[in-house]
Amino acid sequence: MDSGNRGPMPGLSPEAAARFGEGSALVLARWTALQMAVQNGWGGRESRQKADKLASAVLSWFSNDKAPLYIDDLENLLDENMVLSFNTEIEDGSVEEVAEQLMIMHEDCLQGNFELIDQLIN
């Protein structure tokens, strides 16, 4: 029973959770489709807030300790948010790429490895 490490994100130390939050924000900030949607106002006047809500939804998804994390579910979360918030179908493969980056980053953070995040910062 692992009850000793229940911070903001199951399995992640407070430092790892903070670094993952930083890294996930960087991944989403570099996602061209999302940034185009925000810059062009595809979500209306609240496009920036909708992008922020997506970032929060991603962190919440990773915080769910009740079920295993499957990349298909993360892809669906990203895809549905783009459709519902920005009326945008993403068919360039970037949803899958972003989901994969986030899953790898989360796995790395579980192991205390922040190399991917450091690369995004630099």
Which residue ranges define each predicted feature?
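Extended alpha-helical interaction segments
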Residues: M1-S63
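Alpha-helical bundle protein-protein interaction modules that mediate dimerization/oligomerization
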Residues: D73-N122
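Short acidic, glycine/proline-enriched loop segments that cap or flank alpha-helices
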Residues: W42-S47, W61-L74, S85-S94
